[in-house]
Amino acid sequence: MQEYARYGSDWKTLQNNLIGFERSDSRNLDITYVAQTATILGFHDLAKWCKENDLPLSMGVVNNPDYLGPNSLPNHIKQMVLKKCTDIKVDVSQNMLSDYESVDVKKMLHNIERSKFNLALHDKFKRYIKWYESSKPDITPLIDIFPELYDLDNQQGLV
């Protein structure tokens, strides 16, 4: 997922750099995850990796643009995320160099659970992804990484 969200990066190289940086005596490192539609299904793997490597994880939620926020998540995706993340214990750092408040997993899951799926926002999200991928001919399409994001069968409460 890292290579998709941060086009041009290499996850294996980044892993080695982060772990090496964290192990140096004079430095502290926080990993910051911002929950958004394109990456939400990779959160569980990131949280697990941070836990395995004893790295604190700060979190936020995208609200703007709205098509990357929780209201663009299909209902079955919300359920998948809730199921995978319910038991995660994540060390949320409070040392944010940001104006935005970090949130814990419980609050993030609550925000996702309370959100109402909006088909128009989901359509905007898909148009954004199409635009994003159009300038990156060698990128693996998001539909191949997370095809379930594109499955809209049996959505309840469509707006």
Label each PLM-derived region with a short phrase:
Residues 1-5, 67-69:
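A short acidic, helix-capping loop that chelates divalent metal ions and anchors anionic groups
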Residues 10-158:
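Conserved C-terminal portion of the radical SAM core fold
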